[in-house]
A protein has these predicted regions:
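Short beta-strand edge segments in extracellular beta-sheet folds
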Residues: 148-154
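Extended low-complexity, serine/threonine- and proline-enriched intrinsically disordered segments
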Residues: 86-95
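Beta-strand-rich domain onsets/edges
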Residues: 29-68, 151
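Short, aromatic- and glycine-rich surface loops/edge beta-strands on solvent-exposed regions
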Residues: 128-135
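Aromatic sugar-binding surface patches on proteins
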Residues: 110-117
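Short acidic/polar inter-strand loop motif in beta-rich domains
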Residues: 136-143
Length: 154
């Protein structure tokens, strides 16, 4: 009887641990901003978090001193790559002292899913402030997304 109880407890512990793996981490998960019928998805990470194969595919150096911003623009309510919207993406990153640098974005297209990737240096540990401007093709006034991320540079 006692052995069955230990096995049952072990199974419950394993199930709880596996379920915990399914819960998304919110620290650097994609975030969204809505502008009418447009949704902008954005995230920023240090490139050392990329899988080596992904970094190699996109020619990105993996390092805790390099950051990567990923932007996707889609039609609100879109469910697949056909709902992606072509855009012009520009932006800048600043530290809390106000030192600012432009971020150059490049378009990637994989199976119809369009993303805009921009790399930036992480000079020191701290909070970085991002200002991203997104314009649909033919649009003169951009949508602006602002967000912060904390980075640790060794």
């Amino acid at each position: 009887m006692r052995t069955h109880h230990k096995i049952a407890v072990a199974v419950v512990v394993i199930i709880v641990m596996l379920l915990a793996l399914l819960i998304p981490r919110t620290g650097h998960a994609d975030q969204t901003a809505s502008f009418g019928d447009v949704v902008i998805r954005y995230s920023a990470i240090s490139t050392d978090q990329l899988f080596p194969a992904v970094a190699q595919t996109y020619g990105i150096e993996r390092s805790n001193r390099n950051g990567l911003v990923n932007i996707a623009v889609e039609k609100k309510g879109g469910t697949d790559a056909s709902e992606m919207i072509a855009a012009v993406v520009t932006g800048k990153v600043a530290d809390l002292t106000g030192h600012s640098r432009p971020i150059r974005f490049r378009e990637t297209n994989e199976a119809g899913a369009v993303d805009y990737l921009g790399e930036f240096p992480i000079d020191s540990s701290g909070t970085y402030v991002f200002t991203i401007n997104v314009s649909k093709i033919g649009q003169t006034t951009p949508y602006t997304v602002k967000f912060n991320r904390d980075y640790v540079a060794d």
